[in-house]
Amino acid sequence: MFSKILTKVIGSRNDRTLRKLRKIVDQINKLEPQFESLQDEELKAKTIEFRARLEQGEDLDNLLPEAFATVREASKRLYGMRHFDVQMIGGMVLNDSQIAEMRTGEGKTLTATLPCYLNALTGKGVHVVTVNDYLAKRDAETNRELFEFLGMTVGVNVPNMPPQEKKQAYLCDILYGTNNEFGFDYLRDNMAFRAEDRVQRERYFAVVDEVDSILIDEARTPLIISGPAEDSSELYIRINTLIPQLVKQDEEDSEEYRGEGHYTLDEKGKQTHLTENGQEFVEQLLKDAGLMEEDDTLYSPANISLLHHINAALRAHVLFEKDVDYIVKDDEVIIVDEHTGRTMPGRRWSEGLHQAVEAKEGVKIQNENQTLASITFQNFFRLYEKLSGMTGTADTEAFEFQSIYGLDTVVIPTNRPMARNDMGDLVYMTEAEKFAAIIEDIKGCSERGQPVLVGTVSIEKSELLSNALKKAKIKHNVLNAKFHEQEADIVANAGTASAVTIATNMAGRGTDIVLGGSWQADVAKLSDPTEEQIQAVKAKWKEAHDAVLASGGLHIIGTERHESRRIDNQLRGRAGRQGDAGSSRFYLSMEDALMRIFASDRVSGMMKKLGMEEGEAIEHPWVTKAIENAQRKVEGRNFDIRKQLLEYDDVANDQRKVVYELRDELMNVDDISEMIGYNRQEVLEGLFGQYIPPQSLEEMWDVEGLTTRLRADFDLDLPLQEWLDNDDKLHEDNLREKIIEAAVQVYKEKEESVGESVLRNFEKAVMLQTLDGLWKEHLAAMDHLRQGIHLRGYAQKNPKQEYKRESFELFEGLLDTLKFDVVSILSKVRVQQQEDVERMEEQRRLQAEEAARRQQLQHQNAENQLDDGEGAEEAHSPMVREERKVGRNEPCPCGSGKKYKQCHGKI
């Protein structure tokens, strides 16, 4: 009560914001006569002046009144369109990184030109994000003349553009494109191998059109780039035939038989290592099999992949036993958990080991799709320094915009008062009765020349209604979201007298329905029209426009309520643009999905008590209230799901940032020798600690084991025991230092023999290639972890905390493995000359091109991302419970760890 009184006295937050912005609008309006007096060249020169002032340190907000006045004046001269004061307010809201809720027909496209121009003055680039390619191209072409007049460059970012064109587009001052394409470009840039292959620059300012659709409706669906894991089935099979010829080195008499065995075993670490003799023997086998050139060696840079396959096959044969480590069932290798003895279907060993075991057992080698990169829209758009958005319906989701993105919502008043008549809902017992009433309503409108837009929740329902209209001999158009270009034409003419248009909920967004039709479309049909012809078309349109207004304007019919009130408001918002007359009504039945699940008992009980006849409807504020409460429940549930997805993705996002920053650093420097040196020291110290524990007695040292590992992993043949025997003063610390010094010296000799620049290039290539391979495997491991983490709730553990803890352990493992593998490869691989590095680079480039050709870009269904059993927000799929009902005292399926009655059972 008190808060209501306070709001009346001082106004709401929205009112206070508008009052503050109106003062700036007054300043802009005072500048108008001054800007009207400028010549075209003087107006164009304003851009150069503003940029110079910014370079001298002037604040962007100080330039706002003059910049907005410049854009308004240019628009008046080029298009004959003057920005309304409310559009100026909308532009300021967008510039302040907020969401502007502007009703349909209030000119969002023109409003966006104001903050786009202002922020493009910085030279950092502005991205205008739309829901489809058609709107991106249309808006870019609509505003191109205005921006180019003011000295700005305009680009369009659409799928399948050549990389060079895309790179040029990103250099434009203002770039229009879809949310998917901006997101995929970001992921592709972070998979590039050379700095010049990247297309994006910094993410500075984004204006998201239809922001509710992009940041809320699509927020549960991550962007994923996936591709088939490297298809080397044939190579696994061929190498599998070579491995049985290898002989294990005799352990007991290793000194005596050294050189005769081909490999050594480390059963504790589940690793194998080729001996020097083994390496030569394998090289000969590979040459005989035609897998390696005659003058080549196993450790040359181009053969890193071959070495990887040999190691995997050797481990599969000598360390992994059938019916101990795995079983073969239904032509598939299934891992056995070493701790529990249970099988783990769906899990696969990494680093090619699983494929090697499949080759060994003669079953089909599976090359499953692998996630190469992924990100959610929440985390992608939060990368922008400034983010803003506009839509006709944001206020119902204001809390989510604020809590997830930190964006406040400002409701912009309409330029003219709203004149639309929103009538109460009519509820029928059956769908057949409801459709019959809709047909009658459409007939009545057609007879008096009133255009009708019918909104359906799915293509299936729109086809049902279309068939009913055909039977009633009522001419109509059906809109679906498949063909955006035709869609715009149909929507543009949906306001002509007696027009009947059926559209699914999202179809036609972004195109205004003008009463009387679009005179611009009629002019476009004329070839080289004269001014006289244009005026005749306008006069004809004016007559049609006035006739439609007299019939009551556009009438909106909703065939059922959507899960979200916001989608209902979007449908209503198609009518009553810019103060035009219009009306709306929703027709519901007890068979509708929303009514059946959430409101059926109460409302159907009320209808039965009233003793309703067939074809009779109920219209009461209580019914509308019950439906809105049901919608609030669904909105709350969907918000919880999006929030939960974000909490999980935030964990992956922190790791993604670290990996992408490291990649960025590697791409932008030529010399990473300091990083390699630091890693070498860390890896060798870690290995030393495994065999010679800190502050331990010499009797506890495993000198022989350390000697073997140094030889096998780093090609370091060091006589450690001899050093210790000959020097009594040699203790733990200086032995460690001596090993590191020896490793540095060997590497220095390698550098002197091949040349510094050759080795620097090779270091960078190895680091990038190893990082990318491990990151792909890490993403797969994170997917596996996500899929089963909700089960921790049954063990009274918090799944989110467990996910954070285990994913951190996985990531630490990735970083440790990266350091170890890079140091090991650089120590063992023999680089002869620059050609070796170029061969490796060429091989990698060809693989990357092939992978890019086979890549799949997915805007993945959220159902695969969440383990809470909740379905995706798709209006056309009826909400039917497929799984058994969750008991009140059982753990909640959302994975919170709470009981169902204390979590989602409350809703």
Swiss-Prot record:
Annotated compartments: Cell inner membrane; Cytoplasm
Compositionally biased intervals (Basic and acidic residues): 836-853, 873-888
GO molecular function annotation: ATP binding; metal ion binding; protein-exporting ATPase activity
One Gene Ontology cellular component: cytosol
A single GO BP: protein targeting
Residues bound to ATP: 87, 105-109, 512
Region feature Disordered, mapped onto this chain: 834-907
Cofactor note: May bind 1 zinc ion per subunit.
Keyword Transmembrane helix attached: no
Keywords of the record: ATP-binding, Cell inner membrane, Cell membrane, Cytoplasm, Membrane, Metal-binding, Nucleotide-binding, Protein transport, Translocase, Translocation, Transport, Zinc
Uppermost EC category: translocase
Primary location group: membrane
Cofactor(s) listed: Zn(2+)
PANTHER family for this protein: CHLOROPLAST PROTEIN-TRANSPORTING ATPASE (PTHR30612:SF0), SECA INNER MEMBRANE COMPONENT OF SEC PROTEIN SECRETION SYSTEM (PTHR30612)
HAMAP family: SecA
Assembly and oligomerization: Monomer and homodimer. Part of the essential Sec protein translocation apparatus which comprises SecA, SecYEG and auxiliary proteins SecDF-YajC and YidC.
Family stated for the protein in its record: Belongs to the SecA family.
Name of this chain's protein: Protein translocase subunit SecA
Lineage: Bacteria, Pseudomonadati, Pseudomonadota, Gammaproteobacteria, Vibrionales
